[in-house]
Amino acid sequence: MGLAVREKNGKFRVLTGNKIGSLLLYYILSAMKERGAIPADGFVAKSIVSTRLADAICAHFGVKLRCTPTGFRFISELIEKSHTEQGFGTFIFGFEESYGFLAGGFARDKDAVCAAMLAAEACVYYRSMGKTLSDALGEIEALCGCYNEAVKSYTLSGKEGIERIAGAMAALRSDTPREFAGVAVDRFEDMRSGKAMDYAAGKETESEVTGMNAVRFLLSDGAWICVRPSGTEPKLKLYIGANAKTDEDVEALLNKLM
């Protein structure tokens, strides 16, 4: 589902999947908190390449966040476990940066009808307080900071392309960069092996997500970089996220890392 919001200047701003997911998440948790309805064992799910603004929102509301490999089926697996495994928790909301959203756990895949309903509810909810969705986004930024992300894809076709993609992934694992654009890498995660190196703590740990051919770098300034081969196309995909106090500072960080 796509979404555009009207700004104060009357122009429309088309939101990314990450911004929509964050907006719906903030609305859902805000409304549930007002009613005292956030489950004590409630959890939110998102793919590992989706915005870390969701992490900040969940931390604000004291709700557990679970990350998954890319592909909504992995979020669906968590929903299934919430129904079949005692003590696993109660699913609240899940999303991917690729415009997939789901609440409630009645379905097992991203649901545009459900997402459109939530967006309409959010409009009414904020309008009842004299606010717009644009105001709500500003409220989130004031509370959690400004976050933005970028994705770059490199098409590498044929047998040579497959070999180049495999070679790039192997190089990142064997000769791991320790900095990007002068910013130190605090943590490196290899999601295929499930191992991670926490450079800040000086010890090896486990990656947040496993079972995925991807690597992730967490930088000392809060930015992150994830690299993975596409599962459906001959592409190497690069995901970058950053956060700062202002949108201008975030864009500057992203441009530096790109």
Regions found by a protein language model. Name each.
Residues 3-13, 31-228, 235-239, 246-254, ...:
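Phosphate-binding and adjacent anionic-ligand microenvironments
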Residues 17-37:
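Ser/Thr/Gly-rich flexible loops in soluble cytosolic domains mediating phosphotransfer, phosphorylation
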